[in-house]
């Protein structure tokens, strides 16, 4: 089959080489965007008098037929035609004849593919943004139901201080809010039209780039044609934002995996988000959380791969840029699916509130409360820290906790300690009193929830 660019070539291509160079197996995902870009381009060609209105009408009608066939799944693509652009042009030629050749006037595949990618990513990021917004709603709802659910707060995966489970959830709400802000802010760099940049230097035809951009819903055009066809920053930025988002999902999934274990039993995932074992009949594994954790590395790999492809590329287009699509497509699909799965897990998981709170009563996470108590009585904090540290050591040697120490012994340690110490040492009191701004105190959490709701 003749190549659409075959004029200067004499030798015939070989199928196995065609297959290696072809991208149609994956860039056909952008067929809808390619057709939209062509419709805008032909409308602009007609408006500017570059092709007759009658020919523009023929081309437009042909493109709309292809749109209908695409929607019905009736378009067939071939590796002989390399990519989505040449496949569409070939199919258009079959529909309307030689006039189809005028569609590519004042256009290169270089600005064509860039336009397709901008259009595709803009729509896909909008969908991810909606899923991320839904996740934030789920987190707020779950936090609202668990303001007074007490759990251990950790540092170094060791019990540190008791906190509200809602406080823990709202910490992730903050992370996902930043993810949302990054994605929303990045849209303005995706929402730019490269169409009309042609191969790299613009065109001699009197085109109207602003008009085609407007038809496609872009808010701006690239000011430099060379930049327009060479820029893949918008993809790298998306991959970077996605990597940070996946990292946040992965951190939470790691905690869910721990919390569902027999050693913790803080939460229970529903059967829908769990799997069993082929040999051990008792198993209920948090596979979906593990998969999200695993797929995070996959998204990182797509980012590193894209950075490496671009690292040594001179301007403008190079065939290396064919490698910019699969990682983008894969990341879009991975992030979208992971967000939906994760939101479902959080929304439906059961919180074992009693086990959570009990775990704060069999530890020394209330040690800071005793140190603060002494400091409020006038003991220098460093001295109070030393006193409590020695008492914790004594307790561990005797197999008891701070709340088990007799008042008489407390008063031997420091006569300033009174019987109110036992209220101070309770987990609920420890949490309730931490009402500094942004703290885990119940009043602060209620303020945080109200603030969070305003951003939903």
Swiss-Prot record:
Catalytic activity: 2-(N(omega)-L-arginino)succinate = fumarate + L-arginine
The protein's name in its UniProt record: Argininosuccinate lyase
EC number: 4.3.2.1
InterPro entries associated with the record: Arg_succ_lyase_C, Argininosuccinate_lyase, Fumarase/histidase_N, Fumarate_lyase_CS, Fumarate_lyase_fam, Fumarate_lyase_N, L-Aspartase-like
CDD domains for the chain: Argininosuccinate_lyase (cd01359)
Keyword Cell membrane: no
Annotated Gene Ontology cellular component terms: cytosol
Organism: Listeria monocytogenes serotype 4b (strain F2365)
Compartment list: Cytoplasm
GO BP terms, alphabetized: arginine biosynthetic process via ornithine; L-arginine biosynthetic process
